[in-house]
Amino acid sequence: MGFKKLVSFQPDYVPQYHITKYISERTKLQLVHINHKTSPLVHGYFAVPTECLNDSGAPHTLEHLIFMGSKSYPYKGLLDTAGNLSLSNTNAWTDTDQTVYTLSSAGWKGFSKLLPAYLDHILHPTLTDEACLTEVYHIDPENLGDKGVVFSEMEAIETQGWYISGLEKQRLMFPEGSGYRSETGGLTKNLRTLTNDEIRQFHKSLYSSDNLCVIVCGNVPTDELLTVMEEWDNKLPEIPSNIPKKRPFLDNKLSHIPQSRDKVTESTVEFPELDESQGELLFSWIGVPYSDFRNDLAVDVLLDYFTDSALAVFTRELVEIDDPMANSTDCCTDYFMRTIIDLRIQGVPTEKIAATKTKVLEILKTHTIDLSRVRQVVENTKWEYLLNYEKNGESRFSSAVITDYIYGNEDGSSLVSSLKDLSDFDALLQWSQKDWQSLLNRIFVDNKPIIVTAKPSALMYEQLEKEKSDLIKQREAEFDDEKKLVLLKRLNNAKNINDRPIPKSLLQKFEIDNPSKSVEFVNTKSIATVDSYKYNNVSDPLTKKILETRPDNFPLFIHLNHFPSQFIELHFLVNSASIKDTSLLPYFNMFDELFSMPMKILDEESNVETMLSFEEVVAKLKSETIDAQINQGLKGSCPDLINFKIQCRAGGYSNSVQWIKHCLFDMVFDENRVRILLENYLNSIVEWKRNGNVMLSSLTNRNLYSARSLKKSTDPLFVEAKLQEIFAEIENGNFEKEILPRIETMRKQLRANFNKFHILVLGDISKIDDVYEPWNPLIKCLNIAHPVEKLKIPPVPRALDTISSICRTPGEKAFIITTPASESAYMNLITSIPFNLDYHDPEYAIVSLASEYLECVEGPFWKGIRGAGLAYGASMLKLCEINSWGFNIYRGADIIKCYEVGKQIVQDYASGALEFDEQLIQGAISSIINRLATIECGYFETALSKYVDEFCLQRGNNFNELYLERLQNVTKTDLKNAMQKYFVNMFDSNKSVAFVSCHPAKLESVQEFFETQGFTVEIEELEDDDDEIDSEEDENA
């Protein structure tokens, strides 16, 4: 007996993938192999359908405890430590109806070593009380606050408006006894009382081979995969064939979802926030059954029709209007037994909530579907679907497989129906207007919604603060010094047991010989249209054709990257340094909306100019491209490049190029359009201020960069006052006189320096008829004189040229921003490491490896900070482009202790009190290799990565190879020297700058702490919408 093949098929639209589904005849375990060769990574998704009938958090806490050891490998962190050694990365998520464990490996060799151990952890975890204490919840013996990794994670989101409204929706939509009703992450009040016995019982009830689906995606030999799986499966207890397979949710009649709802149910909830200016609305409907794929797709199309793009009905009626009723509309679906459809209306002025709610229902009831537009949405959705599957097939396919495993047919037939072809798209293109109108009425009108209004409440904010204060006072009365000592001993005992060293001999089984040579990276072909490019392979027919057909005096630099694809991705990169007046840079927040502005079109034969409305422009853009956007930088590098990014079908290259010309010359900054979009942007800042991590990034960027940098000059908090002034000017009738000339000056300066344009074309270049001819209209408009100077590779703007004085010489300052709507704290500690953009500096590999050693899973920061429940994450910031390095805390429960523990760890390695572990060093190197493979996980990603390495960072297209060689040569002495020379500086107030985002209740203690550390503290408080935010002084600019 072994694995029986259930189905095997090749999706018509992405033939590079082949999907085969098996079932173990012994144990009923299911295995799905998604075979393809388009990535160096092998991905694993190990899915357990998990139904929980309460808010205890048992599914989520169990997910965390799975990683704390198994019966065969009874050591906390073995899975992650072994993962480091085997070029692998592990993770997991818990959702309402599933818990999924993931494994990502750079190659099959490491994956195959770790797979049996991982599955052993899932089905046979140790689930010790000690692991539960540190990982889930405990009381801090010193300050009597709440700690624990899971607790910290849930505390960070539990007071957010979206979370509270989502939970209320579940309560109203599903009855008592339904698994869909529960908060599987665990409410914090329940995490305090959840016992390990309850978690063990939950595992016993659901974690078995007949409720586990193992999904493996990548370049994996089928016979080897089956051999590994059969060897492991044979060790499991047999499940007799007469015992029905577990089907959570399907087996529970109370979890069955009715076909529809016959009445509207409404509720209002509050979330704690000092700024009471904006709330949000959540509408939720019951959709179609899982197996009704065509109608489910049709519902998705309708949701896009109503919410996606400037043409969307809700966008036109609620958002992009005078005196807007909302900042944005968004939709999502939960693929349960029946689809649950959520529509969120965000950034609703609190005084307009009732009117907005009425307006949404009225639109749905009275709107007449535009057949031509809905068919265009179907067409766009189809090509977006294809592009997503080509770029992220493993993620898309695995998600579909997981849903089918929970709700589909056991024989695999429903999986084939859902993924085999695109016939549902073709069928929807034939639907009549009546068909679409009928669907709209059936799902969104006759079928009644749940409506949840989420309102911000300053009173609730104060009440919660009082409750927390009262809880601490109650504990202070309850826990005298003796009881605190008991807590401390119990916690220290748990840490000692959890941190038992893993035998070196056991870890050696997971090591990979010569890891840097064991990964097969994806290859693409680079072609640059300049003679000086040394990597052009002139013997290659395609390269030869491209170079030979280049017109004389062609003035633009084009770099092409060729690989198999149905699509072209165009990046037109403009150097923002061309904008001489830095006061113009905040106008980028209007400039990036160019793709949705009106456009003038000149008929060259009649010399008659016509104007397309913005609606006509967006419709035309949608018909000629798949996606178009304007943003900053390229793959996280060179943030001062303005990137016009267009994705299109392979035959759409010529039209896409014309859109670049349209943006630079033809788009019209219409006064009404600019005013509406600007007002929407300003209103959206309220929502950003509620996110502690976003505010940390803002605080950091506004101080590390000068106003010359887009990082600072487009930051929402930095530009808020400036954009409010601009908006006031428009309201006062000064658009034509004051505002438009400045925007046009910015555009004129950007397009003037054509020799600074970087043009990057990715995809199947052989499908482009003529690379050069489509650029002629733009070249003509640029009025480039001929002959031009010999074409050279253009320079790129260096972020290092736009840094502030405090970034150049950090010291003494600590900046704190308070975020009332965010319970968790976030921190960056920044110091200087002056590599001066030389990635070949001998110390670069040393510092990189030292960083990875500290932050890798089960490394020092992981054990000392996350493992102690002090924060959800602790990592290193590698800001090499601005000569900076740093220490980051994400979702901190105790930011002060995070600082202290991080400082102690670094100092101990610098002094020699802690010795570097050879296996952990090798694990850190393997983690870096895995990250490189993840960065280059497909053709498009590889092509972008090559371009960044070669042209943006200027470190050569073979940098990774040289870098990995250097990593292997780093010694323990090198690492210790790096700690002494650089890393201790992060915690030295004379050589670092600190940035903290925290709740106002923590401000006083955090401020006092940083002052005791020698920092001068500057505070920025976010409260209500009327409070002004002081910008930094010019000397930091």
Swiss-Prot record:
<protein>
    <recommendedName>
        <fullName>Uncharacterized protein YOL098C</fullName>
    </recommendedName>
</protein>
<dbReference type="Pfam" id="PF05193">
    <property type="entry name" value="Peptidase_M16_C"/>
</dbReference>
<dbReference type="InterPro" id="IPR011765">
    <property type="entry name" value="Pept_M16_N"/>
</dbReference>
<dbReference type="InterPro" id="IPR011249">
    <property type="entry name" value="Metalloenz_LuxS/M16"/>
</dbReference>
<dbReference type="GO" id="GO:0046872">
    <property type="term" value="F:metal ion binding"/>
</dbReference>
<dbReference type="GO" id="GO:0005737">
    <property type="term" value="C:cytoplasm"/>
</dbReference>
<dbReference type="InterPro" id="IPR007863">
    <property type="entry name" value="Peptidase_M16_C"/>
</dbReference>
<dbReference type="Pfam" id="PF00675">
    <property type="entry name" value="Peptidase_M16"/>
</dbReference>
